[in-house]
Swiss-Prot record:
It comes from the Bacteria. This is Inositol 2-dehydrogenase. The gene is iolG. InterPro entries: Gfo-Idh-MocA_inositol_DH (IPR050424), Gfo/Idh/MocA-like_OxRdtase_N (IPR000683), GFO_IDH_MocA-like_dom (IPR055170), MI/DCI_dehydrogenase (IPR023794), NAD(P)-bd_dom_sf (IPR036291). Transmembrane segments: none annotated. It is an enzyme of class 1 (oxidoreductase).
Length: 366
């Protein structure tokens, strides 16, 4: 949805996620336009650009970032390229929405945090979209307003029908469990201090060598515990659920929508015993979190357009959140390999001047 004062965005990487963002910005986001696209496969970039009036293809991602007619950047490129591209965004003062991961290791993620802090601006937002899902927002409000008293623990489920052949056991931690890492930090507003990955019996239907499912146990600064079942080869559908348990009750999100029937013996259902049938199952993350992605990008665009007034160009998880996720996942991979509980190794946030949390912008859509 374009206009003369739109935020001109370069989308780097137009695979499944990047192409989805291009369509989102072009069709539904207000105040922004896709001005440049870039991809390793130039033909793909040209195909997408051809459908957007005035959109150009720039072959080098660093040239796309530096282009004077680009105001902001969406990074949907492979994780190993993020460090160099994020540093270029910081160098040119360009707000950037970076799909996870921030970078592929803890040290470079911390370096990104420090480099941004030195600028005195919040330019990097990380794409943890669940924070923008209405059910997670409801759960967060319930926790923060004290309705159920002190929250004690959480149970999470994260299931996928299948993964690519290249997916290995560590990627279950780094690419899937990372979302529950951010959800835990978002809901409880504190850091995770240790991770223990348990290895149940492997799914016979999983690719050879893939340890799936996995059970993750988190401990937080205040002593809360979170357990997560991650199962990425169910062969069924996409399922994400979270339950919090507190001193005065519990709350549960993630049930699929649709008619569910419970019936007893002789209910005319053609079965001999009691049971349950019906309901709909979400096929993939795009259907489950499509609205959350729209809200995420709209709020980022709003913040990026007004950031010059405050130095805060983001409205959501920032570079520190990306670093924290990397640190927890590194501990998770170590635990997967050793079978032991592993402490999360992070620097003290207060030791980095300028790395404090950004205040949420006030304005349309905020």
């Amino acid at each position: 949805m374009s206009g003369s004062n739109d935020l001109r965005i370069a989308v780097l990487g137009v695979g499944m996620m990047g192409a989805d963002h291009v369509a989102r910005i072009t069709e539904r986001i207000k105040g922004a336009t896709v001005a440049v696209v870039n991809d390793y496969f130039i033909e793909k970039a040209e195909q997408i650009a051809a459908g957007i009036p005035g959109c150009r293809v720039i072959g080098d991602p660093l040239d796309a970032i530096a282009d004077p007619d680009v105001d902001a950047v969406v990074l949907a490129t492979p994780g190993p390229t993020h460090e160099k591209q994020l540093l270029a965004c910081l160098e040119h003062g360009k707000p950037v929405m970076c799909e996870k991961p921030l970078t592929t290791d803890v040290a470079t993620s911390l370096e990104i945090v420090k480099r941004e802090a030195e600028l005195g601006k919040k330019l990097i937002q990380v794409g943890f979209m669940r924070r923008f899902d209405h059910e997670y927002e409801q759960l967060k409000t319930l926790i923060d307003d004290g309705t159920f008293g002190q929250v004690l623990l959480a149970h999470c489920v994260h299931r996928n029908p299948a993964v690519p052949p290249s997916f290995d056991s560590s990627m279950i931690v780094k690419d899937s469990l990372v979302h529950e890492v951010d959800v835990t930090r978002f809901l409880f507003d504190e850091e995770i201090t240790s991770v223990h990955i348990l290895r149940p019996a492997a799914n016979p239907g999983a690719p050879e060598g893939l340890q799936d499912p996995q059970i993750a146990l988190f401990s937080t600064e205040s002593g809360r515990h979170v357990d997560v079942e991650v199962f990425v080869t169910t062969g069924v559908a996409y399922e994400v659920r979270t339950e919090i348990v507190a001193e005065k009750g519990s709350a549960f999100i993630g049930l699929d929508v649709g008619l569910v029937r419970k019936f007893g013996t002789g209910a005319g259902n053609g079965r001999s015993g009691a049971g349950m049938s019906g309901g709909e199952i979400t096929p993939s993350f795009k259907e489950r979190f499509g609205q959350a992605y729209d809200v995420e990008i709209q709020r980022w665009v709003n913040a990026a357009r007004t950031g010059a007034e405050t130095g805060n160009y983001i409205d959501g998880p920032g570079a520190w959140d990306g670093y924290a996720a990397a640190a927890v996942c590194a501990a998770g991979v170590q635990s997967l390999e050793t079978g032991e509980r592993v402490a999360v190794d992070m620097v003290d946030r207060s030791s980095i001047p300028g790395a404090e949390p950004a205040e949420r912008p006030i304005g349309p859509g905020a």
